[in-house]
Amino acid sequence: MRFSHFLKYNAVPEWQNHYMDYSELKNLIYTLQTDELQVGDNEEGFGAGKSSNITDRFKNKFSFKNAKEDTSSGMNKDAGIVEETIELRELPTAQTVAAKPSPFRRMKEKIFYKRRSSSASSVSSTANENLQLDTYDTFVGDLTAEKQKVDDFYKRTEAKFYDKFDALVKDLKKIGVIEYDIDDDTLFNEPIASTNDEVPPLDLDDDEDDDEFYDDQSNIEDNTALLHHSQYNIKSQKKSLLKKSIVNLYIDLCQLKSFIELNRIGFAKITKKSDKVLHLNTRTELIESEQFFKDTYAFQAETIELLNSKISQLVTFYARITDRPHNISHSKQELKSYLHDHIVWERSNTWKDMLGLLSQADELTPKETEYNANKLVGKLDLEYYRWPLPRPINLKFTSINNVALPKLFFTKKAYKIYFIILVTGLLLGIKTFNDAAQHRCMALVECVAFLWASEAIPLHITAFLVPLLVVLFKVLKTSDGAIMSAASASSEILAAMWSSTIMILLAGFTLGEVLAQYNIAKVLASWLLAFAGCKPRNVLLMAMCVVFFLSMWISNVAAPVLTYSLLSPLLDAMDADSPFAQALVLGVALAANIGGMSSPISSPQNIISMSYLKPYGIGWGQFFAVALPSGILAMLLVWILLFTTFKMNKTKLEKFKPIKTKFTVKQYYIITVTVATILLWCVESQIEGAFGSSGQIAIIPIVLFFGTGLLSTQDLNAFPWSIVILAMGGIALGKAVSSSGLLSTIAKALQKKIENDGVFAILCIFGILMLVVGTFVSHTVSAIIIIPLVQEVGDKLGNPKAAPILVFGCALLSSCGMGLASSGFPNVTAISKVDRKGDRYLSVMTFLTRGVPASILAFLCVITLGYGIMASVVKGNATSA
């Protein structure tokens, strides 16, 4: 197995970015080899000097560089060399090299001398020597940077785990597992073998209990499911909690030990690779001699001994708390079993992803086969309510003894469906409009809207139902007003569902997937978070900025998931009741909702809205001009709301470290295609003669990423197709209400009611409606239902800018409903976040107390700042489409 794969299999998933970057160092080696090969055959004779005493070079490398930097720029080169030589001889390690300059120093001085005085015939040789030194310096420099990264992370993590260890020891002392008067060092430093002596088990439950019930139940069988009184008293509960703490800390420390071992193996492997490819001798001189690890903490023998000691102590604690202090080996084996189960569970998806086994189920264990069989039986069986008959009914071939009705007919969802069918039937039977098609279309809209609002069936299944109902209800009309035949209506509605909007939606998913999969979004986001510093409110603001920025390009569906993964080092260290943790989780969700208005591809509702804005000449440029200022202001106000309502100032944080990596050719290719696609979308109105629509531009990144193999069929299958289908259902519903004339009729009726009101007042009215529907139903559904209506209302008003302003404003406001845990994808993601104990960070009340005010703040930003900018950038009435 390749070591890069071995590293991924065995690495702790949450620590992936803190291991040595083996693949990057390997790429560096091959790059340096290519540079050497380009020099030609002029390197002959240099090999012996190159491999001589690399240890001296490593010792003097960094002090040489420092001396070089300290040299005044006004000095001549000879003076600089003298100063460097003096400083090198004054180093603490000079006792081993002062008598005779190292080969590295002699070589450097020789090269500097030749730079001044060599003839033209020796220039090539000097360049070759310079290249070899640069090769060594570059490789060891990068190797040292990786070592420092590993060491820094280990020290931080060890300190955190050892604090937990100390707290655990105190708790164990309180319940008597460890005696106060015993010297900890004496107890802890005993070898495990010495603990095999018989020690009486601890009696934590020595209180007498005179309860006659338990006296009577003294002969209860061992296999009873009832809890004994000793199993739910306070001491027993403490004992169970501490046992769990020991297991968790044992797993943490073992993973920390594997972190050291994996990185040490990695450094040995990569130096072996460099020696083989670049003809160096780094493994022997640096790794095997331990010279490379002398300035680290993680790789010292004392560090490993201390870690092993802590692990051994945990085994002893576990043996004592389980009343088996004489059986250390069994306790050790049991803890190893917990470790194994944890690793298998935590990394199963990682392993399956790498082995390509996620979609394969042909190698099942007997237990898995039995489980699947039972699951199939559960699917096939139907549960019934049964009522016995007074007397059996005897038929020719059977007899009926009772009446049975399936339970699924009496569920909450079933009652919702009954209600919707009843109301739809009433609307079909009662005349609501003079026009028959509009009358039936009203019943259709009510049926679909209620199904979406109640979620009696899944949203995307309702979307599938729309084209069928459109044909059955006969609501589509021809250009002369006649009702379409079923065949014509079917072709018309199905053709309308696949539109430019759907292509842009797929392109948005493609860009989001490729940016996330190739680590580009994560790297950029980590650098943004690194600027936040250590103040909780600054970290909160930067986290909100990151998810807002990511939402612009990879949608506000994927952005919060990626941001939470970046924040996991912070969240993992905090409990669910931490105010800062709650503010962080909620802030990301609210910022992602607001980020849903930030760009034309940041959310499904924006993509749908753009199809209504295009006829008014509103493209990407105008969208950004309105959405970005409104969104940024709303995000800042929500940030102020959060840090004033959550008491987070007492939280102490470590500075977030950015992910330092060099982008590869593939990553630059992805960035180039992404930026080019966005630019084409921005200037789409100017190049409409070439592409025709934004949907055609959307094909470009799809082809360039899937066609080149950067994304696979599995990635395409993983797209959130339910959202795509929901958008298609919305398009079909919009086509139906438009073709039937229902929207026009409603718009005329509303026009008479509000024709004397200004555009601003109308925007406020419909904006409140958008907030309510978006909060209680769905952001996307609110856009699907209301935006076509406001477009018709706006077109009927006298102001030529009314329609684009109303559509634009409602499109932005559709993202502002965030008062409930179910209001939008970001909120659903946030409410599902739990800490390491399995407790939720947020509650429904948290969303109500912060989400509702946040919705109002965002609403005010759109109808004030957003309205002012919209009034200046929109052009007026729709152009001919």
UniProtKB/Swiss-Prot annotation:
GO terms for molecular function: phosphate transmembrane transporter activity. It is found in: Membrane. InterPro entries: Cit_transptr-like_dom, SPX_dom. One of its GO terms (cellular component) is plasma membrane. The keyword Transmembrane applies. Residues 1-288 form the SPX domain. Its main location: membrane. It is a multi-pass membrane protein. Induction: Expression is constitutive and independent of inorganic phosphate concentration and PHO4 activity. The chain crosses the membrane at residues 417-437, 456-476, 493-513, 514-534, 539-559, 581-601, 663-683, 691-711, 718-738, 758-778, 805-825, 854-874. Keywords: Membrane, Phosphate transport, Transmembrane, Transmembrane helix, Transport. GO terms for biological process: phosphate ion transport; polyphosphate metabolic process; regulation of phosphate transmembrane transport; transmembrane transport. Present with 3430 molecules/cell in log phase SD medium. Belongs to the CitM (TC 2.A.11) transporter family. Low-affinity phosphate transporter involved in the control of cellular phosphate levels. This is Low-affinity phosphate transporter PHO90. It comes from Saccharomyces cerevisiae (strain ATCC 204508 / S288c) (Baker's yeast).
